Amino acid sequence: MKKSIYRSLKTQQHPLLLRRPLPPKLPKVPLLKKKVRIVHTVKAREPKEETYGKFDPDESAFVKMDQNVSQSQRPTSTQTICLDYDHKALERVVNIFPHQHRVRRFHWKVPKSTAGSMFIPRCLSASSRIFKNTLSQMKKRAKKSSKKEVKEDGYLTKKTFNTLVLSKEFSKPSPTSYSRFIASKFKPLGTQFHPAPKISGYSQELPLLRDVKRAALSPVPSTSSVIPEPQWSERTHPSAAPSKVVLNTGSLPPARSLPTPVLPRKPLRQAMIENAAAAAAAAAAAAAATTTTTTTTTTTTTAVTTTAAVSGKTEAHKPPETVQRTTRTIGPDAHVLRGEGFKAVAATRSETVLALTTLAIINCQIYGRNALNLKGFFLANCPDLTPVAFQLVYLNLSFNDLNQFPIEILYLQNLQVLKLRNNPIKEIPSEIHLLTYLRIFSIAFNYITKLPDGLFCLNYLEELDVSYNEIENISNEIQKLRSLEKLIVDGNPITSFPPGILKLNLIKLQIENTFTCSQFWLESSWNDPQQLTQICSLFLVKNKLLDYIPDAVRKSLKSTSECDWCHGPKFGEGFRIIRSCDIFGVSHVPIMFHVCSSTCYRDIRETSFVLEGFPSRRIALHMDWVKESKVSNVSFYL
């Protein structure tokens, strides 16, 4: 027995500890990650009209956005409603939790004496989690008290939750640490309230409206800046707007006469002309009045004399009464229209066009102009250019109806540019060589079939445009145009060029839409056999046997052309052969050679170059289709 008592006493003696005691073991606090605490407000009474009718529309609330918060949270908005009707301050109801379901409801009353911003925690503190029994009792009491208040209030029938009441008297902005989306979940109760639309997806400044019943929420700005609300003394108070506007017309100024409009200023010369015309009109009117008076006087005198003669009475001649003419006076402030009338003249279209062209020529003559442009006048005949024959340098007669080359152009001695595009001209006269200083000549889109030899006598010609005509071949005399730099022969049925073109110094050659491709060369160079007289004449000339034949026979042996290869006499047409070369920036330009005999034909067929130009230059020839083993049919006749 004693031993047991001793053991019990021994066990009751605690050993002396040399360290701090451990804290008591408390039950583990569960991690309520998904549980959300809801703020609940006490129901308020219905507002009166004079209470919410005096709200300041300039008040606004700002909510700061935090970039650390997930952007997938629900959008928020705020609405201004009045909950405390005894106090004149406004309160804002906001939702502090994003989710509605699976949350516990509890009440959080914010006192009116709060003067600063509030920080709403994400979850409750640890002490509230531990003493949940006490909190549950507090909830029950709050529910009972709220039920009593709901029964006392006849207008409110449903309890609001998930809301936080913020008084209007908060003058300080929310702290920067509280950066969350706030969504409005408050549904106003009663028949006098209207639901506000939901704003989703963005935020904006929320103004406090005058009428809470018809207040429409605006988005809250997404900027991170926080602007403090203005003080009550700085806000503008609404003033009663007048319901009726009375306009007093008794104080209007008396009616005044409108000032007389001032006539526009006129040039001195125009004023002088108008004054002279007015004076002439006045003189004519005076002359007409005098004539009328004289006629009336003569008629009256004759009538009186006849009456006296018939009656046989001798009465003294009485002066006739003068005719009185009333003159209308024009006041200084009267408006007078002054102008000139033009009588309509019946004229045909050709006469009108001819008058316009004549006027253009007269203007060139008066002002000393050296260019005349009559493009697009559709002239059937060229006007007389004699007045400007020595001064015109540029003449454009394109897009007209000239059927023939205008002879009037040949008298323009100093003409340098002549354009005759789009005219139905069929022939160019050989007298065109009279235009000695002509540099640019364009006669495209006509019906020209042949270029005259006089055209090749223009030593200063630099550009020749004969495109889209009906030219089939060009004379070898083109080699005389040593100043020619640009030749345009597009759109012509031409198959080849003469050898004289190799002597030119062309910079640009255009041969588009022509028959110059190699498929037409063989057909274009087909030869016929020479006549016997032509062969004999060529044999006598080359062997110098003309002195041994009679004169009658010698006259028939005259040569009319020259061989393009040996430059000797050529009787008849001779033989034709096409060789191509790359020249003037164009590849495979076909050159048609007219030779006198089969010997020259064989030589030019086998050669690979030609010497042309001044100074003489070597031009390579392409050995394309002429490399056939079979000799042309012309050789069988020799």
From Swiss-Prot:
Q: Does the keyword Repeat apply?
A: yes
Instruction: Supply the source organism's classification.
Output: Eukaryota, Metazoa, Chordata, Craniata, Vertebrata
Q: What is this protein called?
A: Leucine-rich repeat-containing protein 63
Where would I find the LRR repeats?
389-412, 413-435, 437-458, 460-481, 482-504, 532-556
Q: List keywords of the entry alphabetically.
A: Leucine-rich repeat, Repeat
- Identify one Pfam family in the record: LRR_14
PROSITE patterns attached here? LRR
Which parts of this chain are annotated as the region Disordered?
A: 220-241, 306-325
Annotated signal sequence is none
- InterPro entries to which the protein is assigned, alphabetical: Leu-rich_rpt, Leu-rich_rpt_typical-subtyp, LRR_dom_sf, LRR_domain-containing, LRR_R13L4/SHOC2-like
SMART domains from the entry? Answer: LRR_TYP (SM00369)
Q: Which domain of life is it from?
A: Eukaryota
